[in-house]
């Protein structure tokens, strides 16, 4: 229900609609959670006293499900939703692409701090959302929705200098490092497996087509290729290549 978080009418309706398009259909992580049945971190610590104790934030204790068999954590649904919304907004307002990716990563990080998810859960949520977003943006049936979203974004930014004035370019290196950390969470890298070739998934170029309207698909794919992180990190070496795509860096060029 779009009205729950934003108006589906008015100047920015195109952006609201694109968020709904990306979050619609098969965008939920619930089926994956039911398949993997991977416990949330606070349940692990209760089960094994040798593990670090994880406590849920008091304000979230009411969200704990009584039945642990129906409360999987992998992949994180909140992280998935955050990235889907952020990618839709970034597509609409590409001038703020990297900033929106950073904000999505922050929500995933907050889920870890809250005690509701492990680093692995959050990484899975990012990967899932990236694949889902690309699929929906690549779908020709959504061409009108994408066009309307970009037009709404142009109304939002206009021809003034607001975007430039609000962008903290001095923090770029710090933000880039933060985003990379939240891609990997310093999980152990297999030193013997760091030379795998980058695989850019089919349709991934759609993620950045509004950011680089002057590039063709091949050129955008090379941007994704040249900014992908190295292989060897836990979970990130998926067969298609979604785990290694660094949209923060890719939105800033080769």
Which positions does each model-derived feature cover?
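Hydrophobic alpha-helical bundle signature of multipass membrane enzymes
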Residues: 1-113, 145-164, 168-254
